[in-house]
Structures are given as structure tokens and as C-alpha cells.
């Protein structure tokens, strides 16, 4: 499968969806779900969870797309929100969704979010 991340380069990354890639995708998603559950944790545990979230996102992108040095540096210069968007898109692509489905889902989520904010 071909995945292009314009925020990092013009290169199209060829990703073969192997068991390793799928396993790493699921590990990434699990770590993100676990990092959301920090409400009843100590401040130190919350910091560790935040650091883990940053590392999990960047490591997932680097390893899945096999980024080169210049792309890794660009990734490190992005905001955390941009990095999460990229990681989420890559994970969904690995799981079989196409770009159009992902974009449509994101638009629906944004519309729902703005509705909730209006109420």
C-alpha cells in the first residue's frame, strides 16, 4: 500500500501490511487508549503517560513508514496534534481504510464536535 505524508516529504511510502506492521499498529492504538486513562494517576505517572504518548506516536510513524533522517527531523518539528493526526491516518490506512473514507470520517467527527461545542 502507498502512503504519502505531505507534511514530511513528497515521497510516497510503500508499506507492506505484514503481521509485524499490523501488530505494531494494534500496539500503538492500545498504548494511545491506555494513555487516555490518566485521571486517577499521580502527577509523575501522568508525565510518564504523556511522554509515552509522544514517543508512541513518533515511533509508530517512523517504523511503519521507514522514515529517513530528514523526514524524522521534520516529524520532530511538528506539533503533537499534527503528529497524532498523521499516526492516526497511517494506522487507519494499515487497517484497510482508504484516504476518502478517512477524510469523510474526520469531517463527520469535526461536525459532531462543533455541534457538541455549540450546545
Language-model region placement:
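Short, intrinsically disordered N-terminal pre-domain segments
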Residues: 1-9
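Short, surface-exposed, charged amphipathic helix/loop patches that serve as local interaction elements
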Residues: 13-16, 20-119
Amino acid at each position: 500500500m502507498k502512503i504519502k505524508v505531505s507534511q514530511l516529504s513528497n515521497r510516497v511510502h510503500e508499506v507492506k501490511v505484514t503481521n509485524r506492521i499490523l501488530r505494531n499498529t494494534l500496539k500503538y492504538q492500545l498504548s494511545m487508549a491506555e494513555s487516555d486513562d490518566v485521571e486517577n494517576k499521580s502527577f509523575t505517572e501522568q508525565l510518564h503517560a504523556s511522554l509515552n504518548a509522544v514517543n508512541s506516536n513518533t515511533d509508530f510513524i517512523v517504523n511503519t513508514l521507514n522514515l529517513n533522517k530528514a523526514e524524522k527531523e521534520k516529524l520532530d518539528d511538528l506539533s503533537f496534534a499534527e503528529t497524532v493526526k498523521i499516526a492516526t491516518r497511517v494506522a487507519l490506512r494499515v487497517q484497510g481504510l482508504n484516504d476518502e473514507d478517512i477524510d469523510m470520517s474526520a469531517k463527520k467527527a469535526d461536525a459532531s464536535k462543533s455541534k457538541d461545542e455549540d450546545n
